[in-house]
Amino acid sequence: MASNIFSRIKSPSGGSQSFYQQLRSGEDPEYDPGLDEENLGHRFDDFQAEGMDIGDSSMTVESVAPGSKGKGKATFRPTAHARSSGITSPRWQQDDDGDNEVPASLLMEPKDLDPPASPPNKRATNPGSSRTPASVGPSSARTRAQWEAATAQQQLHQDHPYTTPMGPQPIPVARGTMSNNPREKALWRWVNTSNLDSFMRDVYDYFEGGGLWCILCANALWLFQCIDYSRVPDSRSLHEVIVPQCTRKMSGLWNFAIWLYTFFFIWKCVQYFVEIRRLTYIRDFYIYLLDIPEQDMQTISWQDVVARIMALREENPKTATNISPRLRQFMGSQSKERLDALDIANRLMRKENYLIAMINKDILDLSLPVPFLRGRQMFSKTMEWYLQYCILDMAFNELGQVQQDFLRPDRRRLLSQKLRQRFLFAGFLNLLFAPVVLAYVVIVYFFTYYYEYQKDPKQAAARKYTSLAEWKFRQFNELPHIFYERLHMSYPFATRYIDQFPKRITEAVARTIAFMSGAITAILAIGSVLDSELFLNFEITKDRPVIFYLGVFAAIWATTRGMVSEETLVFNPEYALRNVIEYTRYVPDHWKNKLHSSEVKQEFSELYKMKVVIFLEEMMGIVTTPMLLLFSLPRCSDQIVDFFREFTIHVDGLGYVCSFAVFDFQKGPGNTGPQGPRPDVREDYYSTKHGKMAASYYGFLDNYAANPKTGIPGHLPPGPKPSFHPPPSFPGIGSPTLAADMQGSHIGRTGTETGRARSRAPGGRGPRIGVMPQPSPMASMLLDQHHQPPGGNMVARSLHASRYPRGYRGESQIIEETEASSIRRNGEDDELYEPGGALGESVWETSPARGVTRENSAANTEDPEAGVLGLIYQLQQTQRPRRGGGMV
């Protein structure tokens, strides 16, 4: 909608289409990278077989009887239409021209025999159906006879488009039956869904809203939350509080604001009633197709919803094979066969993934060209709205697909110019509506936090993450409810980390002021208790009684006491920050070995600010946003266009998505750690920063592969008792392999070696006793077969299910691997039989119910120079009995 308005404003004079009309049309016959143009140009529908007559064919077959002397040949003869239009034969025909000898035994009809009498053809009664072959020559009558004989034996198409075909046909659902069966209506809407992105967005919004009645109640209460009823208790009738003709006494600005709010209120009311029908359709989809009643909407997990959608997909497979090219193009992005957990997440976050990647790779210049503000990123909710309008609304069409012009290198200059114009137009638009937006932000903030601050004044100093921090912390394909669950769990640890740093000077001053204000407050309070009537009316200063100063000094005492740290607080900022990293999963590279420093604390404080400061920055953002749109963002328009072209791929059945959002579960996240060779500039450009790709990969597996029934990352369900593994058979005393087996087992270890191996974790923690429970049997149900990760990736360790206890977070909890772990390559048995390892290992664990087995441990210890002894050792490892289990 915004692009249409902008296109009308910038439309050229004359009858030619504007740039945005050409962009929205999206039909370019010369460029269609994701489809096979040669095959899509042909329609092989059985209801259009009339166009496949022998006369319209470009190939004729000359048959010879098996007993004849001639040799059967299949010759290519261009038709008159082909010769006149200058159409050459395709490549596959030119390659086969030399090999056109057909054995006589494979020919269809004898050459000399007359064809049998064919039954009367019903198509002959239709004057438009009969066609005269375009080929001329002596073979025309013979080929026509052969064609009639072949069609008489086996019809290739329906005789008449309006006649009833013979044989059993599917029975259509009667109109009365469908109108009385809500499940059939819901199934019909599901089958005829034309925009899967929009439909899945409605399904997710319905799930996140908690059902039909919760959404309607929230919308109805929103319409009346700005009404003030403070004057109602003081009056007895309505006319006492109404000022007659009050608008005449107001200024023009107030009248404009009242009328604007009135139209906005009416528009929201209309939208509220229109939305009921759409919500009813989604409600029927949940109740009748997914078997989820309304009362379970507030308790069911999203993973269970995805499993039911996949089951519904399996119950209604695709049956049509002969489809038109336009429908084939449509199904290239709207196929219901691509509806597992990863595909649904890609559809819901198709646009958000691009914004996450652009912020991660610093494509957007969010700093002002001002000397004292250079280098400081200005990002607010207002800025987020304009980024959605300027970039995403231009890059995507109505179906949620990336415009193909963004994928063409020859359109780079024009797109960059138009994007720069959109930034400038949005900047002037923001300057025009800045007063309205400022009033809206102030009113919403006041009505939202007034009661909270009045009830608890300490909430004024409460902190929360900024909008920029949320986009930095968010991972690819991470849905909003999963992201905010993870983020909200980090708030206590983030507050504890901020309070960790020593502020001795501030605390000393705060203690002194708290002691003085507390003493004065105590004296005034005791005096008011002894003689309340006389003391409370006593004025210490002019018109300022005792109760006034009692409130002032009590507020000062409460504020200063809040600035003093608790006496039981243990000072360990590095440990506190690791607890934060466990949930935010955000660790820049320059934070390594500096988690205790004040520099890291200052950078984290820019992401975790007080709510009052965030509100002031939001109001200041109304002024800084147009400056960014006018001066900073137009300079990076070329990089934005290049980003969409270079980081967009086409997935069959899904459409165009961000390349970072397509997880290759067969290969894993790749070599993202620094243990390998240093990547070159090209690899650095095509990879994410701060381990975002690896964090998103393992985070997705942690949410959808561990236990989809609960929806809690890293949760272990109560499973059955572990299966019994018999002990291995030991060799005899005289066996030459006994010494080697004893040396590689726990029995042959000395106490020093065992103690050293067990004391790698702090506190000398020994190996875990017992076999851990097996993962849920639904662990592989939310991913299709082509998305199933191999067994080695399923045991990757995650932050939510760390192998260390919560009391310790070692250096390895930085998301990426920080060093090559030589201990991991030694193959000790305690590392094979328990989920443990060295400090340098990554701690992502997506399947906490599994340990590292001999199979997947040996898979990561490849040595290209092993030699003969290494091969013998690998053979011995494969012949040993394996413990642990894997998912199929």
UniProtKB/Swiss-Prot annotation:
Residues 1-255, 444-511, 533-544, 633-642, 664-888 are cytoplasmic. It comes from the Eukaryota. It is found in: Preautophagosomal structure membrane; Cytoplasmic vesicle membrane; Golgi apparatus membrane; Endoplasmic reticulum membrane. Residues 277-422, 566-611 are lumenal. Phosphorylated by ATG1. ATG1 phosphorylation is required for ATG18 interaction and preautophagosome elongation. One of its GO terms (molecular function) is guanyl-nucleotide exchange factor activity. Residues 512-532, 643-663 dip into the membrane without crossing it. Keywords: Autophagy, Cytoplasmic vesicle, Endoplasmic reticulum, Golgi apparatus, Lipid transport, Membrane, Transmembrane, Transmembrane helix, Transport. It catalyses: a 1,2-diacyl-sn-glycero-3-phosphocholine(in) = a 1,2-diacyl-sn-glycero-3-phosphocholine(out); a 1,2-diacyl-sn-glycero-3-phospho-L-serine(in) = a 1,2-diacyl-sn-glycero-3-phospho-L-serine(out); a 1,2-diacyl-sn-glycero-3-phosphoethanolamine(in) = a 1,2-diacyl-sn-glycero-3-phosphoethanolamine(out); a 1,2-diacyl-sn-glycero-3-phospho-(1D-myo-inositol-3-phosphate)(in) = a 1,2-diacyl-sn-glycero-3-phospho-(1D-myo-inositol-3-phosphate)(out). The chain crosses the membrane at residues 256-276, 423-443, 545-565, 612-632. Residues 28-38 have a biased composition (Acidic residues). It is a multi-pass membrane protein. The keyword Membrane applies. One of its GO terms (biological process) is lipid transport. InterPro entries: Autophagy-rel_prot_9 (IPR007241). Disruption phenotype: Significantly decreases the radial growth of colonies under nutrient-rich conditions. Strongly reduces conidiation. Blocks autophagy. Its main location: membrane. Homotrimer; forms a homotrimer with a central pore that forms a path between the two membrane leaflets. Phospholipid scramblase involved in autophagy and cytoplasm to vacuole transport (Cvt) vesicle formation. Cycles between the preautophagosomal structure/phagophore assembly site (PAS) and the cytoplasmic vesicle pool and supplies membrane for the growing autophagosome. Lipid scramblase activity plays a key role in preautophagosomal structure/phagophore assembly by distributing the phospholipids that arrive through ATG2 from the cytoplasmic to the luminal leaflet of the bilayer, thereby driving autophagosomal membrane expansion. Required for mitophagy. Forms a homotrimer with a solvated central pore, which is connected laterally to the cytosol through the cavity within each protomer. Acts as a lipid scramblase that uses its central pore to function: the central pore opens laterally to accommodate lipid headgroups, thereby enabling lipid flipping and redistribution of lipids added to the outer leaflet of ATG9-containing vesicles, thereby enabling growth into autophagosomes. PANTHER family: APG9 AUTOPHAGY 9, AUTOPHAGY-RELATED PROTEIN 9. This is Autophagy-related protein 9. It comes from Gibberella zeae (strain ATCC MYA-4620 / CBS 123657 / FGSC 9075 / NRRL 31084 / PH-1) (Wheat head blight fungus).
